[in-house]
């Protein structure tokens, strides 16, 4: 199958632009497909909530790498979180995928809110860290043709520092997404 996978140039943009533009895109992971409904940006050395605020470490090295790579980490001893690296190589930034509408074939679509819940349901773990999502048909984000105009920006949640930044993007009306169907057809590039 060929998919209209987002390219490195998409992720190399400013993180806030990427976080906004990811709304309505399709996350593909193995056989799962979900429309992205919630994101959060984490930007650079000066963002106190970003892992990169502590500098370059083994854990954060992927954030300093090429845009479009997955950054998956483990928090609170129980949850994995999926991010995609943004901005040009060398500038540490990523966008957290906080929520999707999971598209199902023979049953109603499921709204998944929360990055830990998302990774648990899709079975995304640390073994999926540092994967080039611009070259992997089993783990990527694709264009859908869906333009999201109804969204809100809020402060980021679930963090203790940097809460004042309105860097969380949330689709405000999920009604139309609940009726989308799973597509098993080939996408044009």
Curated annotation (Swiss-Prot):
Give the Gene Ontology MF terms in alphabetical order: alkylbase DNA N-glycosylase activity; DNA binding
Source organism, top-level taxon: Bacteria
What EC number is given for this enzyme? 3.2.2.-
Instruction: Tell me yes or no: is GTP-binding among this UniProt entry's keywords.
Output: no
Q: Which InterPro entries match?
A: Formyl_transferase-like_C_sf, MPG, MPG_sf
The GO annotation for biological process reads: base-excision repair
Q: Which UniProt keywords apply?
A: DNA damage, DNA repair, Hydrolase
Q: Which family does it belong to?
A: Belongs to the DNA glycosylase MPG family.
NCBIfam families, from UniProt? 3mg, PRK00802.1-4
Q: This protein is called what? A: Putative 3-methyladenine DNA glycosylase
| The organism of origin for this protein | Ehrlichia canis (strain Jake)
């Amino acid at each position: 199958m060929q998919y209209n996978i987002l390219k490195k140039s998409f992720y190399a943009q400013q993180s806030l632009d990427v976080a906004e533009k990811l709304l309505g895109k399709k996350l593909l992971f193995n056989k799962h497909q979900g429309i992205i409904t919630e994101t959060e940006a984490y930007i650079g050395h000066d963002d106190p909530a970003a892992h990169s605020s502590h500098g370059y470490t083994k854990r954060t090295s992927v954030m300093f790498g090429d845009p479009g790579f997955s950054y998956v980490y483990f928090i609170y001893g129980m949850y994995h979180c999926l991010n995609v690296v943004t901005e040009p190589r060398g500038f540490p930034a990523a966008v957290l995928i906080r929520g999707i509408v999971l598209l199902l074939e023979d049953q109603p679509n499921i709204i998944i809110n929360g990055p830990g819940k998302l990774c648990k349901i899709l079975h995304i773990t640390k073994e999926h860290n540092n994967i080039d999502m611009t070259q992997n048909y089993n783990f990527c984000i694709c264009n859908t043709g869906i333009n999201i105009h109804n969204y809100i920006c809020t402060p980021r949640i679930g963090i203790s520092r940097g809460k004042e930044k309105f860097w969380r993007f949330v689709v405000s009306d999920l009604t139309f997404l609940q009726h989308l169907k799973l597509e098993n057809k080939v996408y044009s590039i």
